[in-house]
Design a protein with these regions (language model features):
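Patatin-like phospholipase
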Residues: 1-45, 53-266
Length: 266
């Protein structure tokens, strides 16, 4: 797509997180792949990054397939994994063993994709968002670690140290990074949410536990405390941008019948 002066309008795909609610997102992304719809950039938060990378590797159906296959494997996601390793979603099994051995992620196709791929994490020492682009020289292990950092939910995940930073779930600091994508040049965007349009985020009920687990990181605690305010403000911004005609928002009509974690392969 071009403007009258032949300046290309860059298109972006913005994927919210939501753990296994991201399966809704991937149903839509699979359709985009199958219909060969191209975006210049994709930015994913948490599950949006973990699942959205398959848009670049052109592997429709892969996310649903491996989630169904490993839904009852304690190494993938379980209380047992959390108690034994500190991670609800197994760091080694889910983020390395599955994509590199059991249900291979097509890293070569990912690397040659013309679509830029960005992951959002939260720096626990500053409480601010970190936006990491998948550079050409990045190895599959490094990519998987950045994705793991983006998807590492507080309380049920260990802090991920990478790139000289201590990182956790990107949704804490920038749940719907449309504004960031616009600022770096993606003018026309499709945003896929995992909550219905009438959703209003409430303050977390886990702050007492957060204060205990993250007591060394006051800026992270502040971000967690105000996360609902940030999120609801982003929803208002989405509405404004949608009215301007440069943003298309796709969201479920009603609350999805799936929790953050699920062991039901159906």
């Amino acid at each position: 797509m071009t403007t009258t002066n032949d300046t290309k309008i860059k298109t972006g795909l913005v994927l919210e997180g939501g753990a296994l609610r991201g399966l809704y997102t991937m149903g839509i992304v699979d359709v985009l792949i199958e219909n060969q719809l191209h975006f210049d950039g994709l930015i994913g938060v948490s599950a949006g990054a973990a699942f959205g990378c398959n848009y670049l590797s052109r592997q429709p159906g892969r996310v649903l397939r491996y989630n169904q296959r490993f839904s009852h494997d304690w190494r993938y996601c379980s209380l047992r994994s959390w108690l034994r390793t500190g991670d609800l979603f197994g760091a080694e099994f889910a983020y390395h063993h599955v994509p590199q051995q059991l249900d291979r992620f097509d890293f070569e196709t990912f690397k040659t994709s013309p679509t830029d791929f960005y992951m959002v994490c939260t720096d626990v020492e500053t409480g601010r968002a970190v936006y990491q682009k998948a550079e050409q020289e990045m190895s599959i292990d490094e990519l998987c670690e950045w994705i793991r950092a983006s998807a590492s939910m507080p309380l049920v995940s260990r802090i991920v140290e990478i790139g000289g930073r201590k990182l956790l779930d990107g949704g804490v600091s920038d749940s719907i990074p449309l504004r960031y994508f616009q600022e770096i040049g993606f003018q026309r965007n499709v945003v896929i949410l995992t909550q219905p349009r009438n959703y209003v985020k409430q303050p977390t009920s886990f702050m007492p536990l957060m204060r205990l687990a993250l007591r060394k990181y006051p800026h992270m605690l502040s971000a967690l405390m105000h996360r609902h305010e940030m999120y609801n403000a982003q929803l208002r911004y989405l509405e404004e941008q949608e009215k301007l005609g440069q943003t298309l928002v796709i969201a479920p009509e009603r609350k999805l019948k799936i929790n953050h974690t699920s062991h039901d392969p159906a």
